[in-house]
């Protein structure tokens, strides 16, 4: 009597003999099924972007601290309100990215704790100028990251954060416009 075994049955036998051995190559359909598993959002593909995400978290937290500091020194109630709102939004961005980090790694991200120090606030217009450029660069960096990642969900999140950063830059420009005398 002839024994006809499928490739899967043969593979199972070899797995019992030596679990590290793969004597039968994976078929194209098995590879496609394995690839389909890795396509999901925040999966293996997103691991490549984990250092970028860490950097974005730290940047958002730094921006939040800066906005809170600038809000305390703002010359007008409108400026104080805007900077408090921007600080809250930057904190929200950091929390979102920390959630993304957890989805990818299964670990809670612990941000670096800055050493307390005296914050030197330059002239008000200079603060607005610096923050405008920081927000614009942040928008650009998120857009670039969205183009470079292979994870679809990360692409959407990075694009959303890019739009927020550009919106922040426009709000700061509006505040700066009010400071210009004609």
Language model features with spans:
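Non-heme di-metal
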Residues: 1-182
């Amino acid at each position: 009597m002839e024994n006809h075994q499928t490739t899967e049955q043969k593979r199972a036998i070899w797995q019992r003999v030596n679990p590290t051995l793969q004597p039968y190559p994976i078929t194209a359909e098995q590879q496609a099924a394995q690839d389909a598993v890795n396509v999901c959002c925040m999966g293996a593909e997103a691991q490549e972007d984990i250092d970028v995400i860490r950097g974005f978290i730290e940047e958002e937290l730094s921006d939040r601290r800066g906005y809170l500091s600038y809000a305390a020194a703002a010359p007008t109630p409108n400026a104080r309100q805007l900077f408090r709102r921007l600080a809250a939004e930057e904190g929200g961005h950091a929390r979102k990215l920390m959630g993304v980090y957890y989805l990818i790694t299964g670990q809670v991200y612990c941000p670096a704790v800055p050493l307390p120090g005296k914050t030197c606030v330059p002239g008000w217009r200079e603060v607005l100028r610096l923050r405008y450029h920081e927000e614009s660069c942040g928008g650009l960096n998120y857009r670039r990251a969205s183009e470079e990642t292979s994870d679809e969900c990360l692409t959407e999140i990075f694009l959303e954060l890019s739009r927020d950063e550009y919106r922040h830059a426009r709000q700061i420009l509006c505040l700066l416009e009010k400071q210009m005398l004609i």
